[in-house]
C-alpha cells in the first residue's frame, strides 16, 4: 500500500510538471534570436510567492558581484544572458514559450494542463541589461487577458492569453513603443496560470526576462511599478473565485 501511494504521488507530480513552461526564445521583427538574450530559468516550475524577489526575473543578480541568487523556494535563472538583442523603437518582438527547456516544436501545447490565465509584458529602463538586478521600475507594454467566448460557454471555453500561446506554437507578438527612449531594458514576459488561484498563493507566475537594447525612438520614459510590490496575493485577478 505504501509503495502504491508513493507511485501515485510521483505520477501526480509528473502530470503537474507537464503543465509547467518557460519563455525561452525571442524574435525581433521576424528574425529568430533563439535564447541568446534570455535569462533562462533553470526549470519550468513557477513562482508562487509574489513577495519574493523571484517575481522580478525568476531570480535576481547581486549588484556587487553579479552572482546568481535564488529565493527560499529555490527559484532561479542561469544569470545574465549571453548577449543583448537589439530592437528598434516601434519594432515587434515575439516572445516564445514551451513546456520543456530547449523545446521548440509545435506538437504539444506551449503551456498545458488547463493553465489558463493572462500573458503580460513589462519593460524596465536600466543602465546595463546584462547586470541589472530587476530592482528598477517596470512599465507594462502589453497584455492578453480574458475574454468571454459566448453567453452560453463554460469558463474553460473562454479566451485567455495562455490559450493564444497554445494556438500559436508558443509565440506572441509584442510591439515596442515607438517613442520609447533608446538604451538598455529588461523585457519581462509573464504568464499567470490561475487554475489553482482560489486562495492566496495559488496563482502560478511563469517569468523570463530578456536583455534588449532599444535603438532610435524618442524621449518617452513611462512611470512604472516595482517587483515585488506590484502584486498582492489577494489582489483580484491574482486570487480568483
Identify the function of each model-found stretch.
Residues 2-119, 125-171, 194-241:
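Peripheral, solvent-exposed domain-edge segments
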Residues 175-176, 193:
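Short acidic/polar micro-motifs centered on Gly/Asp/Asn
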Residues 176, 181-183:
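A glycine-anchored, Pro-Gly-centered beta-turn/N-cap motif
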Residues 185-189:
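A short tyrosine-centered beta-strand micro-motif
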Residues 91, 183-184:
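Surface-exposed loop/turn positions
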Amino acid at each position: 500500500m505504501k509503495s502504491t501511494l508513493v507511485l501515485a504521488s510521483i505520477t501526480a507530480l509528473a502530470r503537474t510538471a507537464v503543465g509547467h513552461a518557460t519563455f525561452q526564445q525571442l524574435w525581433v521583427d521576424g528574425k529568430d534570436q533563439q535564447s541568446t538574450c534570455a535569462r533562462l530559468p533553470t526549470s519550468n516550475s513557477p513562482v508562487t510567492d509574489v513577495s519574493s524577489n523571484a517575481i522580478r526575473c525568476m531570480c535576481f543578480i547581486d549588484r556587487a558581484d553579479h552572482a546568481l541568487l535564488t529565493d527560499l523556494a529555490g527559484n532561479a535563472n542561469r544569470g545574465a544572458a549571453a548577449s543583448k538583442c537589439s530592437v528598434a523603437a516601434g519594432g515587434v518582438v515575439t516572445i516564445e514559450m514551451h513546456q520543456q527547456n530547449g523545446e521548440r516544436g509545435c506538437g504539444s501545447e506551449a503551456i498545458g494542463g488547463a493553465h489558463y490565465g493572462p500573458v503580460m509584458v513589462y519593460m524596465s529602463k536600466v543602465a546595463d541589461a546584462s547586470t541589472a538586478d530587476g530592482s528598477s521600475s517596470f512599465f507594462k507594454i502589453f497584455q492578453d487577458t480574458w475574454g468571454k467566448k459566448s453567453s452560453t460557454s463554460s469558463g474553460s471555453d473562454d479566451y485567455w492569453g495562455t490559450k493564444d500561446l497554445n494556438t500559436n506554437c508558443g509565440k506572441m507578438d509584442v510591439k515596442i513603443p515607438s517613442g520609447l527612449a533608446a538604451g538598455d531594458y529588461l523585457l519581462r514576459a509573464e504568464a499567470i496560470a490561475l487554475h489553482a488561484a482560489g486562495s492566496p498563493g495559488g496563482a502560478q507566475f511563469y517569468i523570463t526576462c530578456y536583455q534588449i537594447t532599444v535603438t532610435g525612438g524618442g524621449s518617452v520614459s513611462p512611470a512604472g511599478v516595482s517587483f515585488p510590490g506590484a502584486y498582492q496575493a489577494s489582489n483580484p485577478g491574482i486570487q480568483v473565485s
